[in-house]
Amino acid sequence: MKAKYIFLAAFAAAVALTQTSCEKVSPQGVLMAGTAVEDRVDMSYQYYQQNNFEYKLDDDINLSMADEGYSFIVGADSHVTTDLGRMREMFQIGLDNDDLLYCHLGDIADTKPEYYIHLQNCIGEATYNYIEKYYEYHEDDEKLHRKGVPNSVGRDYDDIRFPFFPVVGNHDLTHNGWGMWSNIFGSSFYTIDVPVGYDENGYRVYDHFIFLDTASGTLGRLQVDLIERGVLDGQGHYRNTFVFSHTNIFLPQSFQFASTFPREEAYFLLKQFDKWNATIVFCGHVHKWDERLYNMVYFLTLDSMSERNSPDPGDYLVRVNIDKDGAIDIEKVHMSYVAPKK
């Protein structure tokens, strides 16, 4: 974490901070990126292969929580600048509820280097609070151990990752933002498995989380190829599959496809969701709530949690509660933070 902070601080010093931010962020923006989707996916896939340990949950967490049921929380389009109120609130809400994962649907920050420094500091604060709540120091081995878990593995502070998993959005990439985003989060294209028990034959069963790079409004040839090769399929026995995409598939409150994806890719994704036996597909981007059931897949498009786009308190987060048998309950989660008046 320290090295990444130094990189961002140096980057901030080297870049003239001359861009102006709008009082309200456009949901559409410009679907473009300083680094094209083919390059992003190529970099992400290589990073994911070499560092896939970063996309695994702590075994102690799984053993102590997921087998008996768990929850995860989802937010979208936070557009962080200098005000971290809503992002801090999301993290605190998750900690207070013992949510297992924190997922984000992209456009996490506007692309000034200083905003990414603020964001990384916010994640650092959340990591500290997370460790304070769930870990305790053992003097015998001078390590941090999971509270309430007998024989838990001892860890150093820097080895404990706060379980925050975002996708990349189009606003994360403007003004050459990919370098800043990827420096913090690594890959924009990855999966996570949550162990949730055993089947009748004694095989481990998982819930499967798939994170796509749709920030440019297209998957690109390489990402389609990797998906067709089964890179995101996983190798386990899966109970539920959850898919996360910044760009929405459907227009809110409409039976039409969104205009961002090429039509062939939209159909490709719908077929892929069926192949993955997807339970829920989460989308952001348009700053407008939408929910629908299509081909037995539940699609949720979330409103923006940004205090600029959604200045009043409101239900901007979603929590998914999963019991030990895999049954799912979805609830909207209220956010109370209001930005101080200038």
Which residues fall in each region the model found?
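Bacterial N-terminal signal peptides that target proteins for export
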Residues: 1-7
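C-terminal motif of bacterial Sec signal peptides marking the signal peptidase cleavage site
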Residues: 17-21
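Short acidic, glycine-rich surface-loop motifs adjacent to enzyme active sites
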Residues: 234-253
